Amino acid sequence: MKVLDLDMDYFMTEIASTPFSCEERLDEEYYGDSVWTEEEVRQFLEQNLRLSKNHKIPGRIVTGHNEALIFWKELINSKMLSDPFDVVHVDSHADLGLGDASWSFLQSEFLTLPIDSRRKISEYEFCNKIKGISIGDYLLWAVAYRMVSSITYCANPNGDKNDYV
């Protein structure tokens, strides 16, 4: 099964970036002039993703992109989604955690744990602080949880096409 993972920042001509520690949304003054027109967004959704008012798909709107991972867990637990599944990730950022400490924890400690116990873990210690799954690494966690079998990353056409973080 394929899951569409669509971040609205894809529809910007200038790609916003924030430090991982930032918990609040960027001020609209920072990006307000770079948002695609409604016509451009509709054209992309209808022509590239085959979405329309007549072809609706079930889903959820979330504020923090890492909430998608929580939604996927809910769908799996309710048997509405089976894993592993394929993700079509339409975003200005890859959300694979490079640039944060999670990749190091996942590689050095997490992957040594029994597979059955991995999904119970969503926090780790880094520099004497407890860190959790974030908007910048949730997709990496989904792969580590073995929820995701493949990722098709549709990078923002206005970006450098080399964003794997």
Q: What are these regions, as identified by a protein language model?
A:
Residues 1-165:
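Conserved alpha-helical scaffold segments that buttress catalytic/binding sites
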